[in-house]
Amino acid sequence: MTAQNENAQAQAEQVEVANEAQLEQTAEVQQEQPVEAELAAAYARINELETYIAEADNREKDIQLRAQAEIQNIRRRAEQDVEKAHKFALEKFSKELLTVVDNLERGLNALDTAVTDEKTQALVDGVEMTHKEFISTLAKFGVEAVGVVGEAFNPEVHEAISMQPAEGIEANHISVVLQKGYTLQGRVLRPAMVMVAG
């Protein structure tokens, strides 16, 4: 019996060793499955975070581009405002000077018919020089006269008082200038009052 007992005992040990091996193998498989699941979850989280970081980078770049564009727009508007301020700072002053020019021209027109002696002619010459210098000074600052007989009528710079037929002048052209108009850097200070050939 001893041999049978030994045999049975050996078989029992083999079964026990086999069971232990099977339990270890099952435990390893069970341990591997949660590890693989955790690893897959970790990779998914990594991908999610990388996507979030990429989106955040894109948002940041977009915000920076918009901020730079806004800064450029602000600079451009400020430069335009300064340019307009310089360009048209003289507008009100120039408008006031136009009445002086008008009066000088009226005086010259009246004196042309009244000149009878040298003293009066010297006075006329002095007023003419003053008028020319005045017009020259205005031109230096961008003030220019508009409204010349024969020029095409332009409603942006001319104000038509009436239309009448005129010999030698095409239709829709200025036939008579009642009051000169002026522009400052291309901007109308005062429209020319004119009669237009019809």
UniProtKB/Swiss-Prot annotation:
Protein name from the UniProt record: Protein GrpE
Encoding gene per record: grpE
Record-linked CDD domains: GrpE
Compartment annotation: Cytoplasm
The protein's assembly and partners: Homodimer.
Protein's GO biological process: protein folding
Gene3D superfamilies given in the database record: 3.90.20.20, Head domain of nucleotide exchange factor GrpE
Keyword set includes Cytoplasm: yes
